[in-house]
């Protein structure tokens, strides 16, 4: 809620209206429960929003990536963020199939932490793990493998220690979680109607989210699912851009807005 209050207040700073009328569009995971949806809605209202709308993150990502979601042709979006990976197939302005899993960038950081702890008896923090992931993390063999120095605390001696670790090792650490994402994509493809599957073979799979930039992820996915995979422009901001586009034209995207059950408020969702 504090974060929402900050952004809403920032939006008000340049307002010339004495009592600004804030409208907010928030992206939520497709696996969010009714309780979680209500919590997000209530937090936004308590933070100062006057109208709060919610949209599933994969739909927002697809809009922000510029996919023709209103077309009858099927499009697939895979949004690999920090906390969740959202897999969705969209056609004719609606979500045909969606999957949400809590395996994404944060989980990859934990994979690195656990791998280094197990193999080297070295404890590193989340920031160091993320730096390693960005520097040498990969999902597919690199043309030139890399190494990086990692600093942490030796779990046996309790003393600071530095080791050199390779991109091959980090790829090994990340591989199980990457495979979970791949299997989820395969499951969604297996459930797709034949006509939509044909569209996906033509259109490919669009990757968004910060983790979409992981080295070799496109190659690994393409090889495993046998469908062309491509990364959207500025993938990290696709969900935010999509939410902004929805806010600018709520009528156009009305069918993609997410309602909440038993809404006591009269001015928005319900």
Provide a role label for each language-model segment.
Residues 1-80, 88-205, 212-270:
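Nucleotide/phosphate-binding catalytic cleft detector across ATP-hydrolyzing
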